Amino acid sequence: MVINDLLWRRPRHHMDVDEAHDHVHWVELFFDLVHVVTIFILGNYLSHHLGWQGFWVFTGMFLAIFYAWADSSVYNSLYISTDMPHRVAMALKIVTMMTIAAAIPDVGGEGWMYFALAYALNRALTAYLYWRARCTDNAANTLAQEQARNFFVLAGVF
């Protein structure tokens, strides 16, 4: 049956699964690795901009990158999702983080625009993932609806 195929199954809350396990998929590990590289590049930015302005730019970008990673990790901990739309969204989130990493060295010039656009798209993709998870059959669907709304608003702000 198509609905039982792992590539097309909608997200499920981990509490709704009889035999939930803490298996980490390769895409999540690669997503983490891309964030590590991005933080490394951000550290290089700080080493070349040792003044207060460089520190505050570093701090702001670090917090944005950290929250992009943490929000995705929370989603992947709450929901079991192995279907094709989730994989495409994660691939796009990886591309947005690579764009952010490429924008960091010139963030004081034209790079800020690429950073902001990639970050906004990253937030919109996180909102999309929560929007898809709103169909769960328990109280967690309220959380998914609220998070989807919050991340869409945050994407619009950026």
Model-identified regions with their sequence ranges:
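Multi-pass alpha-helical transmembrane bundle typical of ion/small-solute transporters
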Residues: 1-158
